[in-house]
Every structure is written in structure tokens, then in C-alpha cells.
Swiss-Prot record:
UniProt modified residues of type Phosphoserine: S184, S365, S372, S379, S385, S400, S415, S500, S530
Biased composition (Pro residues): 346-361, 389-406, 416-433
Protein name, as recorded: TANK-binding kinase 1-binding protein 1
Quaternary organization: Homodimer. May form a heterodimer with NAP1. Interacts with TKB1 and IKBKE. Weakly interacts with DDX3X.
Pfam family, one: TBD
Zinc finger boundaries on the chain: UBZ1-type: 579-605
Lineage: Eukaryota, Metazoa, Chordata, Craniata, Vertebrata
């Protein structure tokens, strides 16, 4: 480092100059004076000294950096590509001792700083305590000042009372002096006391103060009498003050007693309110439980009633099919030559009684087979009933039959009914005021009647025996939802006694007979006349009635009560509406949406609201 600056520093020496070169400000130059030369030379020497000092500082910094670099190399040795570590000589480890010394010094300074910090914290705590004590003293001082003000006000009131008594005594003395004017000279009125405290001292002080403002009485007895009166008045005032203090203490004791009684009354009232609230809660829980039980009973009765209605509807369909088959057989006997001419299929033997006509003709023509949408498979009713016709065509069984008044033959299209069961002769349509048998049978009960039947009965006491369920359960009575009770298994009797087909049909007519007031509500729209009106209407009317099977084939399990009766109650509010929607969130549902799924949706609302 020193060799770097040797060339630059050599310019300050005279020897570094060449023989032909001389100092510009040298002493040999006659153009410059001696003072100028000495000044410039001194400036150069000063600059040279500064530069040397700077170079020394830089050298020291470089040495420090070298030591630190060596320490870092010792701490983090470099590994070569061949896996060998750089070795360091022992003299380089001496810098570690310097670092240890610096570390010790820094640790000492750190401890000193921590000690000072702890002292400052203690001083701050002491200062905080002093501030708190000062604040307490200020509060006590303010309290004492208020008490002193109260005492001063009390003293002033007492002094005013004493001044009033003194004035009264002066007036009485003036009257007495006027009465005894012949015995004593006129009394000089006492001057007003400017200060109340001085007046009080004069009143209770020694003889010098006592006679300062009073005239010298001629007789000692009069002054003694007045003094005694004043002392008596003062004692009376002191007695009144003591009585007032006693009354104040009594009132304070009474106030404390009343406060204790008030606290006791508040505690007893809170306990009474808590007990009443618990009783009210228990009563509410009991009432809600009773309501749920009543709803469960009513809902179970509703399901049983719906099961009976389904049984009646299936029985009605069976009766109607039997009547239609009998009418078709009677018509087939009259039109058997025509049916044999149109149907090339072989005849089917009939197991009917001997009074019946001979075996029926072929059941269906090829054209009818091409046009009929129903596959030619025998129905279960044909396999079970011995009185049913042996026609293999399932049209009379698959399509629900209706009375002859609602069927009309099609002259343009060949009927799919087999020749042995031809369609009856067309009849004129009934008048508008008179309903057909199917309309009377399938009359829909009004919604308010359904709700009344649901909410009217609350127990099982009104029911004698259950009706028999026949056929598969409908989609809305499947045991998929936990909130719907399962239908019960019953025998082959309805309401405790067997029913004949004629009595059952009459019972259905009477049960579903529509009231005159509901004529407009459930009147069925009149369909336009068409060639196939009877066939289409029969299929649409009886599509919901499956072919009845044996009652023992499909028996339902024991009924279980529902668990969400509020959901069922909310569901009953939408019985009479055409659009199915949730009564809580007003969410719309399709027309064929099942009731159990809608009840599940309402249950989710009730569970979220913790009802």
C-alpha cells in the first residue's frame, strides 16, 4: 500500500525533480518573494502530513478487514474441487483472541446498558408511584376542601342564628330600658359587628370582649340576667343541633334497612320470575307435545282414509271392468257374424256358464294389431277371474272402462277391441245439468273438506276397523321419507264387514256424490265431439287404476308415526293450490313433484330454524 503512493508523494521532495526542472516558488526564483515561497512550502508540507495520516488510517482499516477475512475463512473453510480444505497457519488463529476480547468488551457494555435500563425502569416505577400518591393527595385535598366548605356554611348558619337571637335580645332590652328610663340613663345602641367570627368571639369571649360593644348597665343584675338568657338560648340551639344529628343517624339507619329490604325483594322477585318462567316453559313443551301427538294421530287417520279411498277406487275399477266386460259379451253375442267376418284369427274357448253364447270369434285383426298401442299379453285379472272372457287382447283390461254413455264407436277407424267384445252403440251425450256415472264416481272432494277431515279428528276412537289395502301403494305413499307413516295391512273387509260389488259401487257413488254448491268448482270441462271420444276418455279416466291383485299378495307393514308434523301441516296449506311451492321459501316445484320430497324440503327449513 505504501509503495502505491511513493510515486505520488515523491513530487513533494526536491530530489524527485530533474536537473533542468526547478521549483516555481523556489528561493532561487527572483520573481517571487521570500514570504510567498515559505507560505507555499508550508502548505505543501501540511498537505503531505494530512495525506500520510489518511494513508495510515486506510492501512489500519485494511489490516482490520484482513483479520476479519481470516476469521471468516477459519469459521467457514473453503473446500476445493478435490475435497481438500484450505489449511491456515497458526499465526492466523491469533485474531480469534482479539475477537474474543472484543466480544467480552461488547458483553460488558451490553450488561451495563441492561443495568442502566433496569435502573431506568425502577425509576419510572417509582415515578409512577409518586404520581399516584400525588393524585391521591389531590383527591383527598379536594375532599377536605369540600368538607371545609360544608363546615364553613354550617358555622355561618349558626352565626346567623346567633345574630338573630342577639337582635331579639337587643329589642327586648330596649323595651326594658324604656320601661325603666327613670332608674337608668338611656342605653347606647350596640354597633353592628362587621365580622361574624369576631361577633361570636365577643359573645363567648372574656369580660374585655364581652363589654366591648355593650353599654355599661347601671345594675349588675340586668346584665347577668341577659347573659344567662343568652346562654340558655345557646344551649337550646346546641340541643337542637344534637337532636338533628340524632334524627339524621336514625334516618340513615332506616335508609340502610329499606335498602336491605329492597335487595331481598329483588332477589325473591327474580326467583319467582325464574320459577314462573320454568313452569311456563314446561307448560309450553307439554302443549307442543300434545299438539304434535294430535297432529300425528290426525295424519295417521288421514293416511288410513286415503288408503281406504284407494281400495274403494280399485274396487270401483274392478266393478266397472266387470260391467263393461259383461256388456261387451252381450254385444258380442249380437254382432258375432260381423266380428267373424272381420277377424281371421282362430276362436278362443270361453269358460263361462252354459247360458252364455258359444266361444268368441278371433280376438283381433292384423290391422287392429298394427294400430293397437297395447301389447297382446293377458292381464292378471284374466288369469284369476273365471268369469272374464278368454279373449287374449288386453285392451278391455289395460284401458280403464267407463259406463257406456262415455263411449262412442269410430266409423272412420277400425276399433282395436276384439270382435267378441265390440263397442256398444253410440248414445246421445247427457244434458249439461246431468252428470255421468264416471263424473259422479271420480268427483274430486274440495280442498277445504280435505283440510277439515285432516284437522277434525284427533284420536283413533272414531274408527272401528281398517279397510283392506289392495294393489301396489302409490308413489306418494312409498316409505322413502322418514316423515311419512307406512300404510297398515288389513283383511278383505271394509269398515268391519264384507262388501258385495253392487253395495260397494253404491257406497262409492254416495261417498263421492258432489254437493250442489260444489257443482261449479269440480265441473269437468266438456270435450269437443270426436270419433274416438269414448276411447280417449276411457283411457284417460282409468289410467290411474292398476289391475287389482290379491289382497294378501301386497301387505303393508305396521304404520309408524311421522316425525315432522309441522312440515305436514304446512304441506296441507297447499292442497287446494294448482302451483306446488314451498310455503316458507316460496320455491316452485313441478306439477308431478312427490309429496314426500316436498315434506323433506320443508323439514330442512324447520331444522335450520331449530323449531
Amino acid at each position: 500500500m505504501e509503495s502505491m503512493f511513493e510515486d505520488d508523494i515523491s513530487i513533494l521532495t526536491q530530489e524527485a525533480l530533474g536537473p533542468s526542472e526547478v521549483w516555481l516558488d523556489g528561493p532561487g526564483d527572483p520573481s517571487l518573494g521570500g514570504d510567498m515561497c515559505s507560505a507555499s512550502h508550508f502548505a505543501l508540507i501540511t498537505a503531505y502530513g494530512d495525506i500520510k495520516e489518511r494513508l495510515g488510517g486506510l492501512e489500519r482499516e485494511n489490516a482490520t478487514l484482513r483479520r476479519r477475512l481470516k476469521v471468516y475463512e477459519i469459521k467457514y473453510p473453503l473446500i476445493t474441487d478435490f475435497g481438500e480444505e484450505h489449511g491456515f497457519p497458526l499465526y492466523e488463529l491469533k485474531d480469534g483472541s482479539l475477537l474474543e476480547v472484543e466480544k467480552v468488551s461488547l458483553q460488558q457494555r451490553l450488561n451495563q446498558f441492561q443495568h442502566e435500563l433496569q435502573k431506568s425502569k425502577e425509576q419510572e416505577e417509582q415515578l409512577g408511584e409518586m404520581i399516584q400518591a400525588y393524585e391521591k393527595l389531590c383527591v383527598e385535598k379536594s375532599d377536605l376542601e369540600t368538607e371545609l366548605g360544608e363546615m364553613r356554611a354550617l358555622v355561618e348558619t349558626h352565626l346567623r342564628q346567633i345574630c338573630g337571637l342577639e337582635k331579639q335580645l337587643q329589642q327586648q332590652q330596649g323595651l326594658r330600658d324604656a320601661a325603666f328610663s327613670s332608674l337608668s340613663p338611656p342605653a347606647v345602641p350596640a354597633s353592628a359587628c362587621p365580622d361574624l367570627d369576631l361577633h361570636y368571639l365577643a359573645l363567648r369571649g372574656g369580660p374585655a370582649l364581652g363589654h366591648a360593644g355593650w353599654p355599661g348597665p347601671t345594675s349588675v343584675s340586668v346584665s347577668e340576667l341577659e347573659r344567662r338568657r343568652l346562654e340558655e338560648a345557646l344551649e337550646a340551639a346546641q340541643g337542637e343541633a344534637r337532636g338533628a344529628q340524632l334524627r339524621e343517624e336514625q334516618l340513615q339507619a332506616e335508609c340502610e334497612r329499606l335498602q336491605g329490604e329492597l335487595k331481598q325483594l329483588q332477589e325473591t322477585r327474580a326467583q319467582d320470575l325464574a320459577s314462573n318462567q320454568s313452569e311456563c316453559d314446561m307448560a309450553w313443551v307439554k302443549r307442543v307435545g300434545d299438539d304434535q301427538v294430535n297432529l300425528a294421530l290426525a295424519y295417521t287417520e288421514l293416511t288410513e282414509e286415503l288408503g281406504r279411498l284407494r281400495e274403494l277406487s280399485s274396487l270401483q275399477g274392478r266393478i266397472l271392468r266387470t260391467l263393461l266386460q259383461e256388456q261387451a259379451r252381450n254385444a258380442g253375442q249380437r254382432h258375432s257374424p260381423l266380428s267373424q267376418r272381420h277377424s281371421p284369427a282362430p276362436a278362443c274357448p270361453s269358460p263361462s256358464p252354459p247360458a252364455r253364447p258359444p266361444p268368441c270369434a278371433p280376438c283381433q285383426s292384423p290391422a287392429a294389431q298394427r294400430r293397437s298401442p297395447v301389447p297382446p299379453c293377458p292381464s292378471p285379472q284374466q288369469r284369476r277371474s273365471p268369469a272374464s272372457p278368454s279373449c287374449p287382447s288386453p285392451v278391455p283390461q289395460r284401458r280403464s272402462p267407463v259406463p257406456p254413455s262415455c263411449q262412442s264407436p269410430s266409423p272412420q277407424r277400425r276399433s282395436p277391441v276384439p270382435p267378441s267384445c265390440p263397442a256398444p252403440q253410440p248414445r246421445p251425450p247427457p244434458p249439461p245439468g246431468e252428470r255421468t256415472l264416471a263424473e259422479r264416481v271420480y268427483a274430486k272432494p274440495p280442498s277445504h273438506h280435505a283440510k277439515a277431515g285432516f284437522q277434525g279428528r284427533r284420536s283413533y276412537s272414531e274408527l272401528a276397523e281398517g279397510a283392506a289395502y289392495a294393489g301396489a301403494s302409490p308413489a306418494w305413499l312409498q316409505a322413502e321419507a322418514a316423515t311419512l307413516p307406512k300404510p297398515r295391512a288389513y283383511g278383505g273387509e271394509l269398515y268391519g264387514r264384507p262388501l258385495s260389488p253392487r253395495r260397494a259401487f253404491e257406497g262409492i257413488r254416495l261417498r263421492f256424490e258432489k254437493q250442489p254448491s260444489e257443482e261449479e268448482e269440480w265441473a269437468m270441462p266438456a270435450s269437443p265431439p270426436s270419433p274416438e271420444a269414448g276411447t280417449i276418455r276411457c283411457a284417460s279416466f282409468c289410467a290411474g287404476f292398476p289391475i287389482p291383485e290379491s289382497p294378501a299378495a301386497t301387505a303393508y307393514a305396521h304404520a309408524e308415526h311421522a316425525q315432522s308434523w309441522p312440515s305436514i301441516n304446512l304441506l296441507m296449506e297447499t292442497v287446494g293450490s294448482d302451483i306446488r311451492s314451498c310455503p316458507l321459501c316460496q320455491l316452485g316445484f313441478p306439477v308431478g313433484y312427490p309429496d314426500d320430497a316436498l315434506i323433506k324440503h320443508i323439514d330442512s327449513h324447520l331444522e335450520n330454524s331449530k323449531i
